[in-house]
């Protein structure tokens, strides 16, 4: 786990460590979409909200998929990750086959006409952000792990198992961590 922070870059998964108990990030899996000297930005993948995209986002009245809590920053903003950078203008590639943002009106049209499927996009309310040096400090106290990302993880609906599966994918000692109870003091 030494120098784990040095592996962090856009397109990696950020996994809350088993001892990170802060409610916003407890057992979360995030995709990092931006990481540079100014800070880091990502979205929580395993926190679907109680309401659907069609109930909260204008122009997407036909989309019955859940909206996801992207993080505690600017929770009045909507963001999206998708796999269709080939047909959405202004999208930023995070890794091959995964894109962030783009023309919202174009996305609405593509979804409403069936050119794009709801399974190819994930919507988030707010985001997770860290200023310069903040995330590095959190790594130093053991709050986070890094793992490889894939489109399968990004678009998975297995929210309850996403954290343990992602931690387990790191192998070795992480396989034990992945099976740790949420509140070991109660055992």
Curated annotation (Swiss-Prot):
InterPro entries: AlgH-like. One of its GO terms (cellular component) is cytosol. It holds the Pfam family DUF179. Belongs to the UPF0301 (AlgH) family. This is UPF0301 protein Cpha266_0885. It comes from Chlorobium phaeobacteroides (strain DSM 266 / SMG 266 / 2430). The lineage of its organism: Bacteria, Pseudomonadati, Chlorobiota, Chlorobiia, Chlorobiales.
